Amino acid sequence: MKLKLVIDSDSDDYRLFKTTISTVAQLRKTAVLRFTTDRLIVVSTPKTAASGAILSGDQGQLWCTIPRDIFTLYNVASIREQNAIAMECQCDSLVNVLRRYERCNHGPLTIKLQSTPEWNQVHTGIQQGEENKPMGNPICALSCAFTEHLGYEDSGKEVSHVFKVGVRLLYKSQDARIVEPMVNYTKLLMFQLPPVNGEYGSKFTSFVKRLDRYATLNHLMIYGDRNSDRSDEGRLRLLVQELDWKLDVQWRGPLEMIVQDDQPSAVPASEPGLVGNVRHLNAGTSMQIEDSEMDIEATDIGNVSTSRPSTSVSPQEQTSQVFIKAKDWKVCSKLYDSFEEVVLAISHDESCVLHCSLDRGTVDEHSTKSKERGQIIYYMARSKPL
C-alpha cells in the first residue's frame, strides 16, 4: 500500500484540514483515518476495544469527511476496494505536528505512510536465544516533512524537519466493522441553527450551554416541533425530567426549518454516495507498505426562557423528541461554537444528529459551482426510550 499527501498552508483548504483534525482532538484521544480514492474520512467514538484498534458502539460517533482536492497531491493505493487504507491515530500527536508546521516560514507539508519494522518487535521472554515476535496490528508511521526558512528566504538557510506520528493499521475485518450510523427519515425534523457569528449567535450559544452547569445531569430530552404560526419556522426545547426536578429550556428566537426531499426510510446523514458507500470496504488484507515517493426558578437569558414544564407532550405529526445523554449535548455546544453552518436533525425516539458543513468557496473565480464541502457529523443515539 502507498500513501502520500501534500498540502500547502497558504491555501484555505489547509484550514479545513486543520479544523477537522483539531476538532476531533478536542473531543477524543484517538480516531480512525480512512483514506479512499475520493476522500479522507475521520471516524471517532468513545468506545474502543482493549487493543485500542477497533471502534464499536453507536453512541456519540463523530464522522468527518475531507475531499481529496484539498491536497495538492493525493496518492493513495492499496489492493482493497476504493484503495482504502484505514489506521488508528493519536489525534494530539498529529495536531502538534501541524502547530509546529504553522510556526515555520511555510512551504508545502508532505505526509507519507512509512513502514517501521523496529516498532513491531516485542521481546516476549528473557531466555537467551528466544526470538522477537511481532505484535497484533502493524504499527507504522505517518512521516510529516516540511522545510523551515531561517532568515531571509533568498539568503537564509533552510532546515528540513521530519516528524513521525505512530499509527496502527486496521485489517479489512476491523475496518468493515466501522459502519456509519443510519438515520430514520420517516419522522425527522431538521433545523438550520442560527450562525454563531450572526445576530442571534451569542444568544443561541447561551441556550445550547444552559444545561452545562448541572454536572450530575444524565439525560435530557431534545424536543422539536413546527411553529403553528409559520410553517417555515420551528421551535426547539431542552427538557429535563429527572426524579426530583424538572426543567424546560425553550429557544424563543427564529429557527429555520429544512424541508425534506423524498428520502429512503433509513440512510446515513451524509450526502448519498459521499460517506455511505465507504462502509463496503471488504476487500484486501495486505499490510505491505511501499515507498510513497509517488426544581429551579424560572429565569430569562436573552431569547432563552426556562420554566417548569406543565405536562409532557405526546408525539404529534409535526413533532420529534428523543432522550440523549447530557455529555453528548455538551459536545454539540463545542461543535456549534466552531462552525458557521450547523444543522440539527431529530429522529423521533431514535437519534439526534448535528451536521456541520465547512464551506470551501467555488471551483474558480469565474465559476458559480461550489467545491465539495467538508463535513463533520456527530451522531447521538437515544439514551433511553420515551
Swiss-Prot record:
It holds the Pfam family Hus1. InterPro entries: Hus1/Mec3. It is found in: Nucleus. GO terms for cellular component: checkpoint clamp complex; chromosome, telomeric region; site of double-strand break. Signal peptide: none annotated. Keywords: Cell cycle, DNA damage, DNA repair, DNA-binding, Nucleus. One of its GO terms (molecular function) is DNA binding. The keyword Hydrolase does not apply. GO terms for biological process: double-strand break repair via homologous recombination; meiotic DNA integrity checkpoint signaling; mitotic DNA replication checkpoint signaling; mitotic intra-S DNA damage checkpoint signaling; nucleotide-excision repair; subtelomeric heterochromatin formation; telomere maintenance; telomere maintenance via recombination. Component of the checkpoint clamp complex involved in the surveillance mechanism that allows the DNA repair pathways to act to restore the integrity of the DNA prior to DNA synthesis or separation of the replicated chromosomes. Component of the checkpoint clamp complex composed of DDC1, MEC3 and RAD17. Belongs to the MEC3 family. PANTHER family: CHECKPOINT PROTEIN, MITOTIC AND DNA DAMAGE CHECKPOINT PROTEIN HUS1. This is DNA damage checkpoint control protein MEC3. It comes from Eremothecium gossypii (strain ATCC 10895 / CBS 109.51 / FGSC 9923 / NRRL Y-1056).
